[in-house]
Every structure is written in structure tokens, then in C-alpha cells.
Amino acid sequence: MRLIIIGAVAAGTSAAAKARRNDEALEIVIYEKDTYISYSGCGMPYYLGGEVDAAEELTPRDPAFFKSKYNVDIHTQHEVVSINPELKILEVKDLVTDTVFTDHYDRLILATGASSVIPPIKGVNSENVFTLRNINDMNRIKNYIDQQKPKKAAIIGTGFIGLEVCENLKRLGIDVTLIERLPQVTPGLDQDMALYVLDHLQKNGIKVYLGASATEITGNSVILSDGTTIEAEFILFSTGVRPNITLAKQAGIEIGTTGAIKVDHSMKTNLSDIYACGDCIEHYHVVTGKPVYRPLGSTANKTGRIAGDCITGGTLSFRGILGTGIFRVFELTVAQTGLSEREAKEQDYEVAVCHNIKPNKPEYLGGKEMVIKAIADRQTGRLLGVQIVGYEGVDKRIDVFVTAVSFGAKVEDLFHLDLAYAPPFSTTKDPVMYTGMILDNAIHHGRDLMTAEELDQLMKSGENYVLIDARAASQFDNAHIETAGNIPHSKLRSAVGELDPEVIAVTYCNKGVTGNAAQNILINNGVKKVYNLSGGHKHYSKLDKFNN
């Protein structure tokens, strides 16, 4: 049997390797239109900034390696230009000789990947305008920086790649400006969490323009939709990718609602003996069960392995994704998984939201705070999604949350996890456990939370309420929320009789713990509706800083 794979980066080579492990007699051929194969695309920003010493470290395998180890024939600079699914014939163009020939397959895998989206604006074809999608892109950028030595750069788009390149250009001493058409950076995050990223960028000397689109590139400048001109000798578009589906559409392969190739759990398309995997396919979301398009290298490798297994008689089955992502920008780690608050509400979940600010380990051993935002279904208690920003231990916590969401855990389950503890590694109540405690109290034990946005709405509503700052008087005097009164936690029991039990009460402290203690006192003394401010004054002041 002859298996042909179109594409030799993450998914295609993963499919080939798994197919060979399952079947030694199978003939495996891969056509790849690029010159590089099986490379680490996610490492490219770090080569540009010098963290990766040599480009060869990102391209450790060549066609000779796959021939020797897996007996797979990889033909680079060969583009498949058409598929005849009835005759099982491909037309292939040799990009070096410009000749076209045909090849026959018994089984076919499309691993055609995705391409950078570039807005159709004037000047995008200028020599100083780049995208970063493959090794050739990376080499062009590196050569340009080495030769032209730009002093100013503009990056259009603030997704993972854009921010990673931003950091690495800044390390080279280049002045960087970020341009984002949305009103926040990192569009995958909720806006309140994105503000932590924005604040960190600005503290590291990055200029950020939000709600602004590039409309024209003229020489060494970018013109924005409001007429602002940004000087930049180097310009990078990091405005997302779209799946490469031209071949699939021409062959009659079904395209899903997300615009990517529709596949089943074994990576089969609607056409007999044709499979697809990697960044060209749509996935489905573990929480909602609905189609999503989230191209990631980890998912590409996974779906490639599944395709290679199923095409050779295996039983691997795709179980969906959560859209888990993580990146670093100037020592800050940002991670997310599952549904954001915005996405959960769009799916009509009644959500409970908490902001848990805790160190990754005891402060006496140098622990550093992280902010964990967790979203749960108020009706069932199921954990729906988590976002984290912090300096240490973020990767460890997000992976625990990923596991929990993947297996349908409820918030109370987090408290019962037997997580590893010793002071060099964690606190006695790990931030994961504490997140579960907060949400369990909110959903099942009447300790309701109020987000900063909800408090702002309450303050503007005209409804009668009392806002209690339960911190010490010195902390209150230093900074407090505008309409708050100060009743320190130590004095609240004696003062509770002066409060109207029918009036909404909102408590807060610095991060939430003492606010919760104050909430308990009020509830246990008959105040009927009491909320604790999620994330306390520390989180509220972050939002207030940017809103004002």
C-alpha cells in the first residue's frame, strides 16, 4: 500500500513516523513545497533574539534522517497542485525544475498547514515588511536585522507570536511599538487579565496602540486608522493565520464551519481514503463539543499521530482541545485553557468567576504572586476555563487545570487533589486547591463573589449598597475604592449591628482572604446579601488604572 502525505512539518512527519511504527511494509512518500521540514516553528522568535544560538537547532531533521530512521521518502520543493480523488492521482510540481508529474496513492493525508493572514493594505509588499510563519521567514528577518540594523520596529497584532517577537526585538535594543485593532492585547484572554500583560509591556518600554488598525505602509512608517504615523524600519504582521484548504476544496473535501477541513475523530475527511491533520483542520472543543479552529504545534503533532495510526489500522481517536496556550513576555508567563468568561457567557453558561492571587511557593523562599482567573458553571459546578499570569509556577498550575477541565472536574474536586507539597515547590494550600475552595464557597456555600466590572456597574446603578474596606486603617488611607468605608476586620463584629441587613454589602481587602472573612461575619450576623470583591483591591486597582 502506498501512503502519500502532503506537508512535512509537524503533523505530516508525525503521521509518517506513526504509520511506519505500525506498518513496516507500507510505502510512505511526503511532498513538501518548502525547503525545510519538521522544524520547531515555536522556537523561531527566540532565535531572532539570540536565546537559540543557531538556526540549525530548530531544524534537527532532514529528509535523509527520515529515510534512514523511518524509510520515508521526503521530497522538498515539490508542490502538490491537484488531487483526483476518483483516480487517486496527484499532480506534483517540482519547484526546482518547474516540471509537473503525476503520482498515485492508496491512502492520502493532507497536512497542508496554515498561512499568515496579511491585511490588503497599501505597502505590505515592501522589503521591510515581514511575517513569521516558517524557517525561510525567520532567515529573512534575521538577515534584515543583521544587515539593516533597524532601530525601530512595529508589530501589528498582539497574539503569542507578536508578543514573543516583541520581547526578542527589545532584547536586541530595538524600540518596539505594538499595534492592535482590538481594545486589548492578547485577544484570547479576558480583558481584565489582558491588562496585566499590557501593564507589563509598558513597564518594559513597549509602546502600545489599542483599537487601531494599520491602513498604509509608506517607507519606514505605518499609518494608523486615526491618522497617527508610527516610525519603523522593521514591520511585522502577526495578525493570525488561515488554514491552507485550496487543494482540499478543489478535490471536493468538506470544509467545516470554521473554514478549516472537517474531519472525524480518526482524522478522516468525507472522501474515501483521504485523511487530514495539523493546522489545516478544524477541531472540536472539549467543553462545548462545538467546532473550533485553534492551530497549535502540540495539536498538530497529536492529530498527525492519530492520522498515521488510524490509516494503518489503529484505534486512536481525537478527544478534542481546550485551546490551551502559554507564552512568555519579559519574564511574565501567560497561560490559558478552556473557555474565557466572555466565551462562556456567549455559550449561555451562568458563570461563577474568581480571581485568586497567590504565590507559587512561600514568600520566605522567594515565592512570586500569580493571578489565577477561573470560570465555572454555576449550575453544575463544572470548571470551564482558567487564565493565569505570573512569574513562576504558571506552567505547573495551568497543566493541572487542563487535566481537571479535560476530565470534567467540578470546582470542589480541585480542593481534594493530592498535589505535591514542600516549601521549595508550593504552599500548603496550592493555588490550584485554593481556586477550588473559592469557587466552591461561591457556588455551594453562599459566599458570592463580585467582579471588579460588576462592582463598577453596581456603583453606577443607583442601587443602595455599602462597600466595606476590611483592611487596616493605614492601608485604607494609602489607597481605597472611591465609595468605600473603612471597617477593619478586627472591628467588624462590633460594628455589624450598625449595618442595614437589607442593603447589599460588598467586602474587600487587598487580595480577597480578609474580605472573605469579613463576608462570613456579615452573613453569620444576618446581612442578607453579601459579596466579596474578587481579587480584592489589588485586582480592582489594576483595572481602575487603565479604565481611568
Residue locations for each model-derived region?
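Glycine-rich dinucleotide-binding loop and its adjacent helix/turn
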Residues: 110-172, 207, 263-265, 487-491, ...
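Short hydrophobic core segments
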Residues: 104-113, 232-240, 304, 381
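Beta1-alpha1 glycine-rich phosphate/pyrophosphate-binding loop at the start
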Residues: 1-73, 77, 166-189, 324, ...
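Rhodanese-like catalytic fold shared by cysteine-dependent sulfurtransferases
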Residues: 412-466, 473-506, 510-548
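FAD-site-proximal beta/loop scaffold in flavoenzymes
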Residues: 125-149, 220-223, 229-306, 400, ...
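Rossmann-like dinucleotide-binding cores of NAD(P)H-dependent redox enzymes
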Residues: 59, 152-154, 160-216, 295-299, ...
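Mid-to-C-terminal Rossmann-like scaffold of FAD/NAD(P)H-dependent oxidoreductases
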Residues: 1, 21, 280-392, 426-427, ...
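A Rossmann-like FAD-binding core segment of flavoenzymes
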Residues: 25-27, 75-96, 103, 170-263, ...
